[in-house]
Amino acid sequence: MTQVYIAEAATITSLGDDLDTLYQGLVQGKSGLTHMSDPGLPGHLESAPPRFDTSVYTSPWAGLIPNLIPKELSLNNPAPLIFSLADRLLSKLGPIDPSTCLITASTKAGIDLLPTITRNTALLPKGLLVSSLPGYISQKLGLARPGFNISAACSSSTIALAKGAAMIKSGRETAVLVCAMDVVSEFIFSGFSTLGAMSPDPAAPFDKNRKGLTLGEGAAAMLLMNKKELNTAKKTGKRTHLTQISGWGVASDASHLTAPARDGLGLKLAIQEACQKADISFSDIQAINTHGTGTRHNDEMELTVLRDLFNPTIMANSIKGAIGHTLGAAGAIEAALCIKLLETRILPGTPGFIEPAPGAQNIISSRPRPFGKGPVLTMNSGFGGTNAALILSGVAP
Amino acid sequence: MNNAMIRGMGWVSESSRGYPGQVLCSKESHGLPRISGKEILDRPHKAFGRMDPFSKIGFAAITFALADAGIARSKSKKNIAVIASSVTGCLETDITYQATLSREKGILPSPTLFAYTLPSCFLGEASIYHGLTGESFMVEEEIPDGLQGLSLGLDLLGDGGCDALVCGLCNSNINGVGPINTTCPEPGALFFVFEKQGSRPGHGIITENRVQNIFSLGNKKINSLTDLGKNILVKKTN
């Protein structure tokens, strides 16, 4: 059977511009969340330019990437902020073969350009449509094909990785590059504020007193390869074998547009499918990265799923109290983090978690914990009732 | 080689909507039709009235396609996947939301409208109404043919990842907004229902030659999902 290897991974988050820094920051309990309006408060980043006035919204907090500023494609032709983020992400990668298939994952990509067109609708700027993101990245990398974007709310990049893995397994592709990213814009910020989903304080996933989510921005790239392609890359010294995506599953709740199914039906189906593909049972999984947004319904649903499928000693965490909810990029950032989990066998703590929500005791901890040898699971859910799960395993010596 | 039987087809375009044998021509002189819930649903469904125009046309085309395929809405959930391709996404909805945001200075934008600025939300609406628990996601790309989404869907169907596949196109009308540096697709929605080949009749067999990256309906090469729809209708007429 064709195996799917992760040959290279890179992340950019509010906790730093690489995967090691992100992982170390999480283990050390650091927070990348920024108070966007009050420089006097802890967490304010002087290097982050003000994005917008947050005084009318329900939260001033966000996980912003330092020094991320928009560029101009040409004179008076602004590019969306996401193109700057894409440039920064691509600079972290080694050479990519032009035959590589590109899948991007983003929910709203260049939506920060929208205010410019409502004032002057003469010409829609390049980069406003999400569909332009893969073309931009493909051109930057000199790929033979333009690629495509997968959009499925907060499961976008988890599904993109699942599709990339499926394409390699089926023999359709030998190498797939998944680039996931989303930025904090007023458009998105106002929406989550008006939905009442944002916490006035930094998000506290699985805490009894959690009040909602904190938004963040980030990016992740993962280069997937089959064994033959990987061996060739290894011989040329370009790549190392990091880990495998051994299982993936995607399913819908068919229940509610903006709230998860209380019984976690869709997420259970996705995990079940991922375990079947990986040929493992639930009890083989050693640690779990949850979606863990900090909203009441999401965290409750995930705890139900953990309780129903896994044994009571399972360890799980959420990183969204440290870097915020990075929407379409969340799944890929968290999957990349699983590489570090498999390498170190230490699961970072859950920032903001103080008093356990019902059912969270022992499963969630604020502190890093060692876990046993075996695969790890990462899972995400989103609006529209979408759910996706990935199983990662097998780190090379 | 991937292949599947086309069981159903449904669409909403500027000129007509429905499915083969059940076509309603538009009364509007231009633009996409305003579709009422009564026209497509077997019982009242409040959510339909709340949807943005992009979601309404996508939801309606999926509903027409499932009706054409004889897949009735039932209480039992079905492992049917939904994949939609789009160039424009829900840009019209984004613009409407942004206008409320600018007008109200961020204080009172509509939460419902915001939810529909995620273009994949109509797939969730269709999943909820029809009880579909399979995969659902949008493929957004500058090439408007919809064939990338079809490839992903046929792989999924062939691999046993779903019992049936709903796959198609959905695009906003962005002509009123202004030109854009990309191929502007025709506004509207077009969806098909695919199943593995079996005894049930259908509109024909779609075949994908994965080596040559060619799709065909019988001996006829297919260049896009729109092309596929036109060929099915021509075949029906003949």
Which residues make up each language-model segment?
Chain A
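Extreme N-terminal starter segment of soluble prokaryotic enzymes
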Residues: M1-A7, G374-P375, N387, G394-V395
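Condensing-enzyme catalytic core mediating Claisen C-C bond formation in acyl metabolism
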Residues: T2-T13, L19-D20, Q24-D38, G43-E46, ...
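Conserved small-residue
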Residues: E8, L26, A86, L102, ...
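Conserved catalytic cysteine-centered active-site region
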Residues: H35-P80, S106-K163, R172, I188-S190, ...
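Stable alpha-helical structural segments in soluble proteins, enriched in small hydrophobic residues
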Residues: L81-P95, A160, A270-A278, L309, ...
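Short beta-strand segments
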Residues: I103-S106, S151, V176-D182, L224, ...
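Active-site-proximal alpha-helical scaffold in enzymes
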Residues: L141, F148-A180, L215-G237, T326-L347, ...
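Acyl-CoA/ACP chain-elongation machinery
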Residues: R172-T194, S199-A203, R210, W248-R262, ...
